[in-house]
């Protein structure tokens, strides 16, 4: 079926198996040895998968500086061999890495310029890019769009029995529910992902979600109970969260949450109202308004009203 590439295909699949079973060292050893073979054969599809896995292993083990240049290295190979159809997946790979590094500007640029349009006919070759797009929606706070796209893909993946992608979709659907504060729905979606992950031993698929997987699993275990499988993922996800603390943090999550009163005062600030006018609107003394304003400045890490309004606009608080 795969001809001369069969050995490389097998070794890449085996490397993924090692990785999912939390053996990053042997996965990296195997996939790194396969890359020169794929380059010699100019098999860009297999080469892309191999280099993307290599990049993932490096990034998730805290080697961000070594991982980032791989995107341009793959891009150079694509240009040289003419496999332009892989460009969509490559651009998505860069956006995926930006999610882990907390680089929202790169994520937003990819969404606006290169991300596939899920409102058109879904193209299976873009499945990787669709999965990345769900993550990007989650990062910028568009939870409903993330959930809609995940449900679209789940319908297709169930029919095609693509269990690894299906597991990821259920997990991302749980992610969207968690971000939206719907924890019962989160547990339902996460349970579906866990059922598949446990059957096929997709340990890293879930653990690589880091701090948010920890948050989801803690809530899940309180409601549905714990077992050795979820405990193992919880430990590994905690390690990822420590190495990559900014992964999937929405802009507002970088700052201490504002109280309801502080949010209301901040909105009046954005309208250009004076402290006197805000005091009248909120039926509070000027001193009280100024006290709450100081709390806003401290939480948003700014020094004055204009900076607070600007920061709130950047982080989606207004």
What are these regions (language model features)?
Residues 245-294, 298-299, 307-318:
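Helix-turn-helix DNA-binding segment
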Residues 132-139, 148, 175, 179, ...:
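Linker/hinge segments immediately adjacent to helix-turn-helix/homeobox DNA-binding domains
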């Amino acid at each position: 079926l795969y001809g001369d590439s069969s050995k490389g295909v097998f070794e890449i699949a085996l490397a993924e198996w090692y990785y999912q079973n939390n053996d990053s060292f042997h996965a990296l050893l195997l996939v790194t040895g396969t890359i020169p073979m794929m380059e010699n054969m100019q098999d860009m599809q297999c080469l892309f998968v191999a280099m993307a896995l290599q990049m993932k292993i490096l990034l998730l083990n805290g080697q961000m500086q070594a991982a980032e240049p791989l995107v341009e290295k793959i891009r150079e190979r694509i240009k040289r061999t003419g496999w332009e159809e892989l460009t969509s997946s490559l651009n998505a790979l860069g956006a995926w890495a930006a999610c882990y590094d907390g680089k929202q500007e790169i994520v937003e640029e990819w969404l606006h310029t290169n991300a596939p349009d899920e409102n058109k006919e879904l193209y299976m070759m873009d499945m990787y890019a669709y999965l990345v797009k769900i993550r990007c929606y989650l990062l910028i706070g568009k939870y409903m769009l993330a959930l809609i796209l995940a449900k679209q893909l789940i319908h297709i993946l169930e029919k095609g029995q693509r269990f690894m992608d299906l597991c990821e979709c259920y997990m991302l659907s749980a992610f969207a529910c968690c971000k939206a504060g719907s924890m019962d729905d989160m547990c339902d979606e996460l349970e579906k992902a866990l059922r598949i992950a446990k059957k096929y031993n997709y340990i890293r698929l879930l653990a690589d979600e880091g701090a948010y997987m920890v948050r989801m699993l803690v809530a899940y275990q309180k409601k549905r109970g714990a077992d050795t499988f979820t405990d193992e993922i919880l430990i590994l996800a905690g390690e990822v969260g420590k190495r990559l603390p900014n992964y999937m943090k929405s802009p507002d999550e970088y700052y201490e949450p504002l109280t309801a009163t502080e949010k209301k005062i901040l909105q009046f600030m954005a309208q250009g109202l004076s402290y006197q006018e805000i005091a009248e609107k909120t039926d509070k003394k000027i001193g009280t308004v100024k006290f709450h304003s100081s709390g806003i400045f401290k939480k948003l890490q700014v020094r004055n009203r204009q900076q607070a309004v600007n920061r709130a606009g950047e982080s989606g608080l207004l």
